[in-house]
Structures are given as C-alpha cells and as structure tokens.
Amino acid sequence: EERVQALTGAMRSAWMQGDKTETVAEATALLAESKLVPELAAEAHYYRAKTLMAEGKPGVAAKDLVVLAKDTRTAYGAEAKYLLAQWYFDAGETEKAEKEVLDYIEVSTPHAYWLARSFVLLSDIYVKMGRELDARQYLLSLQQNYQADDDIAGMIKSRLAKLNKEE
C-alpha cells in the first residue's frame, strides 16, 4: 500500500511538472501493482494516455483509451471515449469513428462537455462522408440544446458557417 501511495505521488508530480518520460514510467509501474483500486488504475491509464498523445503516439495511447472508454460515467472515461473517436477520425477510419460516437450517444455520460464534443466530431465525420445535411442537423440540435458557456458554441458556429458557405 505504501508503494502504491509513493508511485501515485510520483506519477501525479511528474504529470504536474510536465515530465512526460517520468509520467509514463510511473503510470506503467502503478498499473503493474496487483492491489490497485479501480480509481487509481483509471487515473494511471488517463495520465499515460494523455502523455503518449502529447508525445505524438496516439496509437500507443489508444490501448489506455480503450480501457478508460468502457466507463463513460467517469470524467476520465468520458474524455477517453471522445479521444478514441477523434483518433479514429484523424487516422482516416471514418466508419470506426462514427461507430464510436454513436455508441457513446447510446451509453451516454453525465459529462455533457465530452458528449457535446462528440456530437461536433460526428458532424465532422458526416461532412467527410458527404452527409452535410446530417452534419448540419446535429450541429443545429446541439446549438439548441447545449447551453454551457465553453468552447462548444464557437465550434458549432464555425462549422455551420463553413457548411453554409459550401452550399
């Protein structure tokens, strides 16, 4: 238990200092512990995934994202589900990205921001598939139903403007 506490502290410290190598090393060591509570395992997967993505290794990070995305009730899982779909989209796997987002919509999450980001991503997916009408409908619905004061409104506005310009 003391070892787990020490590894957790080292991982968090490395993360906060932006030490990518150490964050990955400590998270990996923590995940190797046999008596790790699920919350700490999720935190370790999250920090490792985010660090690997920042290092330009999204394919390696995807393994952690898949684990986290199984539980969208947590903040880590909610973000991971979105990031996984975004990674598929960026990798040119449009159908896989669409499937991931549609699955996210079905299982839902209490973390509205990540679900809203997923709807924006779905509109990008549909534009890429040539389904501009579907993309517009999702954006308009999101614009009407999502009221938080964050960057989502700007994303919706810019995408709708682009769609209107292409008509």
Please report, for each region that a protein language model flagged, where it lies by residue.
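Acidic, polar-rich low-complexity tracts and alpha-helical solenoid repeat scaffolds
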Residues: 1-167
